[in-house]
Amino acid sequence: MMVLGHDENGHMMLASLPTSKDHVPSDMDIKSGCIDLPDRQVNVFVFQAGENVTTLQNGLSSFSFDVNTFIYGSDLDTYPTATFQSQIKDKITEIVLIGKISDTIFNSLKECLKNSKMVKNKFKRIL
């Protein structure tokens, strides 16, 4: 799960589950970064396989996805922060920090989603 932001009260978090499912039109080259085609109803941010996406910190090594990985603007959703924290406390959900996404990539991802017609306005306000 990739957390993209929180509402102004911190009660809801905006997140997306990165996927290896490729729904990019077959006539397009898949390149790293933003693909936004409003006339074809496509908004996706692509992480190419093997591309380092994290910054090194606190003993964590660099991280890259093994396969091309996608975050689709249409797949964003909000989740109650309190529920998520409760699940962690009660050991229902386990969090494994694999790294901190680089600021450059994270900002590009947020701009890609924020500028898309495919992303709901309520989500854009959080971004």
Give the location of each predicted region.
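Conserved functional hotspots at enzyme active or ligand-binding sites that engage polyanionic ligands
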Residues: 3-127
